[in-house]
């Protein structure tokens, strides 16, 4: 029975807020522990703390701390990007959607994946050639430093805060289950590990934690997919035909369109996922860890390939769950429903193909996933405060490298404390909307500023500031007035804003506001900023003047 409890709560915790309806909510009681999961989890923690110690001996300068000295290779960075982005949420959530809806489950995996070609073709090269530590370096390259960096830092911190809350609650409840610890103690433990990785190891430790997590997740998913295909003689025709025979919907699971009841919400969600990815600060920061634009492009190429492979595996896993889990009464309750809900499908499949040992491995991988993400988020938040706000706005570029590093490390500790407090505060709250809101803000505030600053010569500080703030505020306000918060959280009968995700509308507001207030800007400063675009364009195309490798 303890295994079933663990499976149920793992599915509840890690089913993605964007891809599953169930929130991380309610009280989780302590359950008997899974010893295999604990052993593998402790091995992972010991390994990553060893890496942190190794990284701390090689992290001396500001460049080392923020970007690992620019010495990460394209392949390593691609693996780390994949590790930063592939989540246990998408692993469990998309597999569950395939299990319940068949072909339609691909809609969400495509939404997560399709943003990466945008990064590859529009952003990667110019971002690396123009920036140094954060994306605000790029946005403020020819615009006024103080207001643009303030806006960029605020956008980054809001996204980081929303992500951290979701991750801390999920990680805290997972550790609570695995160790039988009190939830508060579990959240504190996660916060301490997160701070240790970033405080002592900086970007180098964060990168290797993400690489290890990516390898483990890809191995686990590959093993499950191979075992599924082995059961059907490695024949996709057999896999799909047998699934259609077993599934209650029959042939309908191979037809698209069943999940998309509201095309406006679907479009808004798709836009948020596509363009929000290109505005996530912890993803954009990874481009500065490589030596030049060529390695930056290679990073996205490898990351996209690895993630495409991963989402392909989730499709096999979902159909495999129909065969090996859906047809097995051991995984059903008395009513015939899947134990723990449909989000259990992939984890039940792990038990079916690998037993309790492999279930323990998947549990440890789930926690590794959360640690990898929170480490990247914490470093992105710390760099926004120390590099963009403190060094560039408060000290107006006069801060010494040592001073900036000190502020960054203080910020890491502060973010750890805040993350712990918010994790405790939101223990019993519906936080499912937070990841959707984070993507919407990234798509509505960060992405328009980055894109237009690199490609539109008529952009001015006035336009960027107005459009960026309008996009951020519109995304937040519409999310509050929408069905998730206004009805489910606040308890009103009907939402004021009828759609669940605001990106479609908040992005329009951001781009129109930026365009309008830029073209109507007739100030001397605006004219000078337009003239500086040519020099920026040359730098963005050639990389002349960038620092690479250890000098970066």
Curated annotation (Swiss-Prot):
Pfam families: SSF. It comes from the Bacteria. It is a multi-pass membrane protein. GO terms for cellular component: plasma membrane. GO terms for molecular function: acetate transmembrane transporter activity; glycolate transmembrane transporter activity; symporter activity. GO terms for biological process: plasma membrane acetate transport; sodium ion transport. The chain crosses the membrane at residues 6-26, 35-55, 78-98, 103-123, 151-171, 185-205, 208-228, 264-284, 305-325, 357-377, 407-427, 431-451, 467-487, 496-516. It is found in: Cell inner membrane. InterPro entries: Cation/Ac_symporter_ActP, Na/Glc_symporter_sf, Na/solute_symporter, Na/solute_symporter_CS, Sodium:Solute_Symporter. Keywords: Cell inner membrane, Cell membrane, Ion transport, Membrane, Sodium, Sodium transport, Symport, Transmembrane, Transmembrane helix, Transport. Belongs to the sodium:solute symporter (SSF) (TC 2.A.21) family. HAMAP family: Acet_symport_ActP. Transports acetate. NCBIfam families: PRK09395.1, PRK12488.1, sss. This is Cation/acetate symporter ActP.
């Amino acid at each position: 029975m303890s295994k079933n409890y663990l499976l149920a709560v793992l599915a509840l915790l890690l089913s993605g807020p964007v891809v599953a309806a169930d929130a991380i909510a309610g009280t989780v009681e302590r359950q008997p522990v899974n010893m295999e999961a604990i052993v593998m989890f402790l091995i992972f923690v010991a390994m990553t703390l060893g890496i942190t110690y190794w990284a701390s001996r090689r992290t001396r300068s500001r460049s080392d701390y923020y970007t690992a000295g620019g010495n990460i290779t394209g392949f390593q960075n691609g693996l780390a990007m994949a590790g930063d982005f592939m989540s246990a949420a998408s692993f469990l959530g998309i597999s569950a959607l395939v299990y319940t809806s068949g072909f339609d489950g691909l809609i969400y995996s495509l939404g997560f994946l399709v943003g990466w070609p945008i990064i590859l073709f529009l952003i990667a090269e110019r971002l690396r050639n123009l920036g140094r530590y954060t994306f605000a370096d790029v946005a403020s390259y020819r615009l006024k430093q103080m207001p643009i960096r303030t806006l960029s830092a605020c956008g980054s911190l809001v996204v980081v805060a929303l992500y951290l809350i979701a991750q801390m609650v999920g990680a805290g409840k997972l550790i609570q289950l695995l160790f039988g610890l009190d939830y508060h103690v579990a959240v504190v433990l996660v916060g301490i590990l997160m701070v240790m990785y970033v405080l002592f190891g900086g970007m180098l430790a964060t990168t290797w934690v993400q690489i290890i997590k990516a390898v483990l997740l890809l191995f686990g998913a590959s093993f499950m997919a191979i075992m599924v295909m082995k059961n059907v003689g490695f024949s996709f025709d057999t896999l799909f035909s047998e699934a259609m025979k077993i599934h209650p919907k029959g042939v309908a699971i191979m037809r698209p369109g069943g999940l998309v009841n509201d095309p406006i919400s679907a479009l808004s969600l798709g836009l948020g996922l596509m363009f929000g990815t290109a505005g996530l600060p912890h993803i954009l920061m990874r481009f500065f860890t490589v030596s030049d634009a060529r390695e930056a492009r290679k990073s996205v190429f490898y990351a996209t390939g690895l993630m495409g492979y991963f989402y392909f595996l989730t499709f096999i896993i979902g159909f495999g769950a129909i065969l090996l889990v859906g047809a097995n009464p051991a995984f059903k309750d008395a009513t015939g429903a899947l134990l723990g809900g449909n989000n259990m499908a992939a984890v039940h499949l792990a038990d079916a193909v690998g037993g309790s040992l492999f279930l323990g491995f998947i549990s440890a991988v789930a926690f590794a996933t959360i640690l990898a993400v929170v480490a990247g988020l914490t470093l992105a938040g710390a760099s926004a405060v120390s590099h963009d706000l403190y060094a560039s706005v408060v000290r107006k570029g006069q801060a010494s490298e040592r001073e900036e590093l000190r502020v960054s490390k203080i910020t890491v500790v502060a973010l750890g404390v805040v993350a712990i407090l918010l994790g405790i505060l939101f223990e019993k709250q519906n936080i499912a909307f937070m990841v959707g809101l984070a993507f919407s803000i990234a798509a509505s505030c960060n992405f328009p500023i980055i894109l237009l600053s690199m490609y539109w010569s008529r952009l001015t500080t006035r336009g960027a500031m107005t459009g960026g703030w309008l996009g951020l505020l519109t995304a937040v306000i519409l999310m509050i007035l929408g069905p998730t918060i206004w009805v489910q959280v606040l308890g009103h009968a009907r939402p004021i804003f009828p759609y669940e995700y605001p990106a479609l509308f908040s992005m329009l507001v951001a781009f129109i506001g930026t365009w309008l207030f830029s073209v109507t800007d007739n100030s001397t400063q605006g004219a000078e900023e337009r003239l500086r675009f040519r020099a920026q364009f040359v730098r963005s195309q050639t990389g002349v003047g960038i620092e690479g490798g250890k000098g970066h």
